[in-house]
């Protein structure tokens, strides 16, 4: 028994794909205590999903397939191959753990850009009035 798992952010983007021949709880404990990914990656994780496979080879193959399909931000480039030509039916992803509430893309803040636009607009109005 093996698993392919993915980390998703609050916008429901796949940000990392991995596989394990261990129990999911053991692998997640490794990730979140002494993980090899950046702190930025781990702090961006909102949900963890997985698919269970019969063999480790199946899980490894599907990891590579999903990395090429989703092109996750935190996977290493050497596992990406734009020339992958197979298409596989995806099993249903099951949720392992939800860490943060997902945000609809329309609800997302524009951050700094919003502040710049508001400041520019206020300045333009001020110039017209005075």
Regions found by a protein language model. Name each.
Residues 2-15, 22-102:
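Structure-specific nucleic-acid interaction/processing domains
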Residues 101-130:
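C-terminal single-pass membrane-anchor helix
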